[in-house]
Amino acid sequence: MSWQAYVDDHLMCEIEGNHLSAAAIIGHDGSVWAQSATFPQLKPEEVTGILNDFNEPGSLAPTGLYLGGTKYMVIQGEPGAVIRGKKGPGGVTVKKSTLALLIGIYDEPMTPGQCNMIVERLGDYLVEQGL
């Protein structure tokens, strides 16, 4: 399965009538493996900041999580595995796999729990596959 198919079929899938507003799979080096058409252009320092938070959990909390220049307030995640952010009625879930970052961005009416489920389910699968 291509990385784009993982984004299209698994991250941008429908859950209880809702969809993520944007999603991507990004390599640890910052290269985009696949993304939805609506995913923002990430800056290298944004990817570095995310990876640093996985290595040193809590490092993004004071400054916020930035994606394409949009700031998200960091909320409780799973140290070293999942970073969650909130901005108004929407937010973001970032799951780290062995080789990549899976990023899902949502807005209402999708709930944070639905976003977490979609992103983390695929992330867990990729980890199991050694990816």
UniProtKB/Swiss-Prot annotation:
Pfam families: Profilin. GO terms for cellular component: cytoplasm; cytoskeleton. Signal peptide: none annotated. SUPFAM superfamilies: Profilin (actin-binding protein). The keyword Kinase does not apply. Keywords: Actin-binding, Allergen, Cytoplasm, Cytoskeleton. It is found in: Cytoplasm, Cytoskeleton. Occurs in many kinds of cells as a complex with monomeric actin in a 1:1 ratio. Binds to actin and affects the structure of the cytoskeleton. At high concentrations, profilin prevents the polymerization of actin, whereas it enhances it at low concentrations. By binding to PIP2, it inhibits the formation of IP3 and DG. This is Profilin. It comes from Prunus persica.
